Amino acid sequence: MALQIPSLLLSAAVVVLMVLSSPRTEGGNSERHFVVQFKGECYYTNGTQRIRLVTRYIYNREEYVRYDSDVGEYRAVTELGRPDAEYWNSQPEILERTRAEVDTACRHNYEGPETSTSLRRLEQPNVAISLSRTEALNHHNTLVCSVTDFYPAKIKVRWFRNGQEETVGVSSTQLIRNGDWTFQVLVMLEMTPHQGEVYTCHVEHPSLKSPITVEWRAQSESARSKMLSGIGGCVLGVIFLGLGLFIRHRSQKGPRGPPPAGLLQ
């Protein structure tokens, strides 16, 4: 990918070289250095396509004129920059070229040549449901939907009970930054679970082709114990079945050795 440099940056660099290479005044005992600087800054808003370009012109460490793409024209920062700002704003070609540098410089350098449609990194969320307290059925409780490690920040999390959206008793934390550009959020639902009810956390995010749905089913302790016992029994059954087949296979092979003498005649 070729790095694009705003055209006015090259002009500023030429000015710097001309100023620094100017001959020393004859008869002077010391040199005076004048430095003109140009800074091009691109600002990217997380999770959006919005890009802002700011170009700053600096003379001897003092900014004197600036272009801000949100403003759309040059503005003098000091009186020194007023003539330049007025002149550049009066030249349609200069303004058009500078405005285009939001795409030709900022967007180009961020996206690269392989894509022109996606400015943002996408990370799919991980979703899990937990119960805040271990309580029996028919007692007030809180379900917590943990949505973690997603980017960008825009996300929609909803709760459903038996297929119907729940809006009462729903609360959420603020978005939490993980420090690696990804986010996490907790969305809580206050409820009183009853036997057989199904609660669903429904998550929509730009990284997903279809929403993520995670279910939690209200079960009594006895039903949960029976289910776990059944799962454990199935696992043990598979283990013993495999062991029995292995032993049978080994026993069918029999000892290896030469055939009986009668078969050799």
UniProtKB/Swiss-Prot annotation:
PANTHER family: HLA CLASS II HISTOCOMPATIBILITY ANTIGEN, DQ BETA 1 CHAIN, MHC CLASS II-RELATED. GO terms for cellular component: early endosome; external side of plasma membrane; Golgi apparatus; membrane; MHC class II protein complex; multivesicular body; plasma membrane. Residues 123-216 are annotated as: Beta-2. Coiled coil: none annotated. Residues 28-122 are annotated as: Beta-1. Gene3D superfamilies: Class II Histocompatibility Antigen, M Beta Chain, Chain B, domain 1, Immunoglobulins. Ubiquitinated in immature dendritic cells leading to down-regulation of MHC class II. GO terms for molecular function: peptide antigen binding. Residues 217-226 are annotated as: Connecting peptide. The gene is H2-Ab1. This is H-2 class II histocompatibility antigen, A-D beta chain. Residues 248-265 are cytoplasmic. It comes from Mus musculus (Mouse). Residues 28-226 are extracellular.
